[in-house]
């Protein structure tokens, strides 16, 4: 079993519809509206997360292991910012509602 297979098995990840692997480990709802959630999300090989816009909740992405992950964010002002997440650099990025990434 290789390292990726071990991670998938140990974290009990399932294929994500947008690509990659994931598992929700926490989620709560109040009055039918999602307030917060936490997921594990892993991209490997040629997988990617397609550009999408956040509605309602902030997302915080953390880098735990592997090669650099570039996250391109289009802010509310239309400005493009690229975050380079890696073990030796920026290890998290906060993306707020209304932003595309």
Regions found by a protein language model. Give the residues of each.
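Non-catalytic, conserved peripheral segments adjacent to functional cores
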Residues: 1-93
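Surface-exposed interaction patches
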Residues: 99-101
């Amino acid at each position: 079993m290789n390292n990726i297979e071990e991670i998938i098995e140990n974290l009990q990840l399932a294929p994500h519809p947008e690509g990659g692997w994931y598992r929700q480990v926490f989620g709560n709802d109040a009055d039918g509206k999602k307030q917060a959630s936490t997921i594990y999300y892993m991209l490997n090989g040629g997988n990617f997360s397609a550009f999408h816009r956040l509605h309602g909740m902030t997302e915080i992405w953390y880098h735990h292991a592997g090669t650099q992950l570039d996250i391109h964010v289009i802010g509310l002002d239309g400005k493009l910012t690229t975050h380079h997440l890696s073990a030796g650099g920026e290890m998290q990025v906060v993306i707020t509602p209304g932003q595309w990434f």
